[in-house]
């Protein structure tokens, strides 16, 4: 039916003029934002004329008719008629030229910043543009003329989300569309005849479907026989961050077309999204073998190899055409290479502090998934006797499984990369006293790189040290302490920094009554492993045997901080404190090891407790007070850590006579008595102030 001709308004002319001068429909145009220049009054939007965009609906049959899906506009109170758009193609659809078809490309990694498509989205057949939807219609009024008017979102300040589209053109970082939360989808064309409806951005999907990504489209694609269609839906899943679903679809596409390099490259992209870097490398290598001239697979493989710290292999793939495919990535590669060289040089001269600096710099420069660089930091911490840092850094080492065959034989600091990982692991296992694990790790390193002298020497050392330690343990259990000490000494000759062997030999000296030598070995063990509690306990016991009560109390106090609930340590500390007081001539009559806070129920009981010799700490509280509830557990812990002090608790609600006698008006209040005299009163104490006061008066 012919449309009636309406006079063109001034806003229409301005809109057409700006649209014609600023908007184009170039296929390879970078990411863009549609510019609406209609009436600033209405929130409704109309279909811009002369533009082809990625469609949000699809044709349902091969006939000339098609239906447009409706979408929700950006203004919630005003419904909008959805736009039916045509799919981007490499040819000009108006001229009917279908000779040019886009080449199938694969996904880029998230870390790259180059103007290539995110995922391969080539179509297996040409598609027809959908009919243009009617323009929005406004009611007549004195502001806008009646009839059809170009409407804009010019007055809207609300931000719109960026949605990855599915066009076939080269858009830079994928096909980025501007929208209000609706995911666009291009028409499904299975190549035969009719197109299947696609409603990827439908707001009516259930939350469970959105969470899993297993939509009807996904289920249909996974059973499909058209590899291009399967790949297209896989790309949609990838763009939404549904990497598991995308991976399954790429697997299906590869099963249908095993020699297609783009499918394998896309599968690698999904694996990268799942942090399965080792598998992604293998997939890229398979893609390159399938199509040695496929630049996208070479580029993605180069980026992965940079992340793994494999700079030589990465350069080969980055410059496979004789020149770098991405100058920015080449700069990243060169930065990683520079710091790697400095790191290896510093390791060669055992400058472990520089090793830490350069390894960190290489990781920050781009080698953020390199196991050998992380293990190099572990080794540096170990050599600097910072075992706690080495252990925590060991947990951060990236797991590359399976380790790529092409990477395993490349060299790092003179040994195979994979062998170096086990080389360091053997050292840290031995330092922690897990000798059997150390032997297995050293054997693994030796199997991977049997010709490396450094690996062979470590394997021999670890094996001999483990044997010496096992022999020493057997002799110690048989109470042959002198022979056991000799066995441990043999292990220390091979590994002179092993805290476990020093501690074991100290135990032998203790049993033989050689307290001074026991203390010396404990000092050595603590030098190499400061947080190791066993040598601290043995040194405290040796100091007690030699009646060095001050040193013994100091060691036991350090132990009680590490082991606050250990009753044996608390009791040993109490006896050492009593002995120290006695050696100073202080009165120690009737001092008993308590270990628990004593609750007072009567004024007579309170007065009796005040007359006890030594230091008494009284905690005045009420059961209902929040601050009292917070401080009570801390008072209990102080009682365990300072066993020579009497800790008493008074609930002034239950015993108001005591509160009145002591003039307690605010809780919590702590009073400290020494030999029956009050020396300190603290109202609402903090934990720090309370502990400082207790420690001060316990000495």
Swiss-Prot record:
Induction: By salt and ABA treatments. Residues 9-20 have a biased composition (Basic and acidic residues). The keyword Nucleus does not apply. PROSITE patterns: TPR, TPR_REGION. Residues 166-182 have a biased composition (Gly residues). PANTHER family: TPR REPEAT-CONTAINING THIOREDOXIN, TPR REPEAT-CONTAINING THIOREDOXIN TTL1. This is TPR repeat-containing thioredoxin TTL1. It comes from Arabidopsis thaliana. The gene is TTL1.
């Amino acid at each position: 039916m012919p449309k009636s001709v309406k006079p063109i308004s001034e806003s229409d002319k301005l809109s057409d003029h700006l649209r014609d001068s600023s908007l184009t429909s170039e296929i390879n145009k970078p990411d863009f934002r549609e510019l609406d220049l209609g009436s600033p009054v209405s929130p409704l939007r109309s279909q811009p004329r002369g533009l082809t965009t990625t469609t949000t609906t699809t044709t349902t049959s091969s006939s000339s008719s098609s239906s447009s899906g409706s979408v929700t506009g950006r203004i919630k109170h005003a419904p909008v008629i959805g736009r039916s758009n045509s799919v981007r193609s490499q040819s000009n659809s108006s001229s009917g030229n279908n000779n040019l078809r886009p080449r199938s490309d694969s996904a880029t990694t998230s870390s790259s910043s180059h103007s290539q498509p995110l995922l391969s989205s080539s179509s297996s057949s040409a598609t027809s543009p959908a009919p243009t939807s009617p323009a929005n219609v406004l009611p007549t009024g004195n502001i806008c003329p009646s009839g059809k008017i170009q409407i804009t979102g010019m007055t809207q300040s609300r931000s719109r989300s960026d949605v990855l589209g599915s066009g076939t053109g080269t858009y830079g970082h994928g096909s980025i569309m501007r929208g209000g939360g609706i995911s666009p989808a291009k028409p499904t064309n299975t190549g035969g005849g009719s197109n299947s409806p696609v409603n990827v951005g439908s707001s009516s999907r259930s939350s469970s479907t959105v969470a899993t990504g297993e939509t009807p489209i996904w289920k249909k694609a996974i059973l499909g026989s058209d590899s291009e269609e399967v790949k297209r839906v896989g790309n949609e899943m990838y763009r939404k961050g549904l990497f598991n679903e995308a991976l399954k679809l790429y697997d299906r596409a590869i099963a249908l077309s095993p020699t297609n390099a783009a499918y394998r490259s896309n599968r690698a992209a999904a694996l990268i999204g799942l942090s399965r870097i080792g598998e992604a490398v293998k997939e890229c290598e398979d893609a390159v073998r399938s199509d040695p001239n496929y630049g996208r697979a070479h580029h993605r493989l180069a980026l992965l190899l940079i992340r793994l710290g494999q700079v030589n292999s990465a350069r080969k793939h980055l410059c496979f055409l004789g020149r770098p495919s991405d100058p920015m990535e080449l700069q990243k590669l060169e930065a990683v290479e520079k710091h790697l060289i400095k790191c290896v040089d510093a390791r060669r001269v055992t400058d472990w502090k520089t090793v830490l600096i350069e390894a960190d710099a290489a990781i920050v420069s781009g080698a953020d998934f390199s196991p050998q660089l992380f293990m190099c930091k572990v080794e540096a911490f170990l050599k600097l006797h910072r075992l706690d840092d080495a252990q925590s850094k060991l947990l951060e080492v990236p797991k590359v499984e399976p380790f790529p065959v092409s990477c395993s034989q490349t060299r790092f600091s003179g040994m195979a990369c994979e062998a170096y990982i086990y080389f360091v692991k053997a050292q840290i296992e031995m330092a922690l006293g897990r000798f059997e694990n150390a032997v297995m790790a050293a054997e693994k390193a030796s199997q991977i790189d049997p010709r490396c002298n450094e690996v062979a020497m470590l394997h021999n050392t670890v094996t001999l040290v483990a044997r010496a330690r096992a022999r020493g343990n057997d002799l110690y259990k048989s109470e042959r302490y002198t022979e056991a000490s000799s066995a441990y000494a043999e292990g220390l000759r091979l590994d002179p920094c092993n805290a476990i062997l020093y501690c074991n030999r100290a135990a032998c000296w203790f049993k033989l009554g050689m307290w001074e030598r026991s203390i010396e070995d404990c000092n050595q063990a603590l030098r190499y492993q400061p947080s190791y509690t066993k040598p601290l306990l043995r040194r405290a016991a040796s100091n007690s045997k030699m009646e060095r009560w001050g040193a013994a109390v100091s060691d036991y106090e350090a132990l009680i901080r590490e082991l606050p609930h250990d009753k044996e340590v608390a009791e040993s500390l109490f006896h050492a404190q009593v002995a120290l007081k006695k050696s100073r001539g202080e009165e120690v009559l009737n001092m008993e090891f308590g270990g628990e806070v004593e609750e007072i129920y009567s004024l007579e009981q309170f007065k009796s407790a005040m007359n006890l010799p030594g230091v008494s700490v009284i905690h005045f509280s009420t059961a209902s007070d929040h601050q009292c509830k917070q401080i009570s557990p801390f008072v209990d812990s102080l009682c365990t850590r300072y066993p020579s002090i009497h800790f008493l608790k008074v609930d002034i609600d239950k015993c108001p006579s005591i509160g009145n006698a002591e003039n307690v008006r605010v809780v919590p209040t702590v009073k400290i008595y020494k030999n029956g005299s009050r020396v300190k009163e603290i109202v609402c104490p903090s934990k720090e102030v309370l502990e400082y006061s207790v420690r001060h008066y316990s000495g």
